[in-house]
Amino acid sequence: MVLVYGGSFNPPTIAHEAIIHKLHEEFKPKKILIVPTGNYFSWKTDLIDFEHRFKMVELMTQHLDYVEISRLENTKAFLGSYHTLNELSKRYDDLYFVVGADHIKTLDQWKDYKKLIENYKFILLTRNNYTFDDDLLSKLGLKYEKMMFQSDISSSEIRKNLNQNLDKLNLNVKTYILENKLYEEVKV
């Protein structure tokens, strides 16, 4: 089993770190692949450059030998999760796509979502007792497992008020953000 955990990681928080640890603890995968999204989201005006986000994830996970960070989505064009998983499946067997359960309600709007559902298994992350729409999951035909976690930490809240939220960041990530003066001009 290899888990693929994608996200903007803008910035990666201690909640992301806790999720990685819990995924490893609960599912015992051979590897967890972290896939930061590329810079192609024109509607995400506060998304800092891929290289900074990649480096922060690297700093946060450097002590975890079961984590690998992928540059696969560092492209100029949006290709979609199916394309990413398809490319990764050329190197890894038994892929599971880790996704927040709240994203499932819009899954039918994703690029190549039917192929994604047909070809890959999911691990649905549920935060703070999120209620699943079992009818929707059944209708989609999703092959999935669930993992619950408790957290109120939000990357967007950290970006809005960095100084008040530094305690929600891994020490290495915090140092990197301060040294590189990231998120100083973010106005969300």
UniProtKB/Swiss-Prot annotation:
A GO molecular-function annotation: nicotinate-nucleotide adenylyltransferase activity
Pathway: Cofactor biosynthesis; NAD(+) biosynthesis; deamido-NAD(+) from nicotinate D-ribonucleotide: step 1/1
Catalyzed reactions per annotation: nicotinate beta-D-ribonucleotide + ATP + H(+) = deamido-NAD(+) + diphosphate
Alphabetical list of InterPro entries matching this protein: Cyt_trans-like, NadD/NMNAT, Rossmann-like_a/b/a_fold
GO biological process: NAD biosynthetic process
SUPFAM superfamilies the record matches: Nucleotidylyl transferase
Pfam families: CTP_transf_like
Keyword Zinc: no
EC number(s) from the headed UniProt entry: 2.7.7.18
Role this protein plays: Catalyzes the reversible adenylation of nicotinate mononucleotide (NaMN) to nicotinic acid adenine dinucleotide (NaAD).
NCBIfam families attached to this UniProt entry: nicotinate (nicotinamide) nucleotide adenylyltransferase
Family classification: Belongs to the NadD family.
Descriptive protein name: Probable nicotinate-nucleotide adenylyltransferase
UniProt lineage: Bacteria, Bacillati, Mycoplasmatota, Mollicutes, Acholeplasmatales
Gene name in the database record: nadD
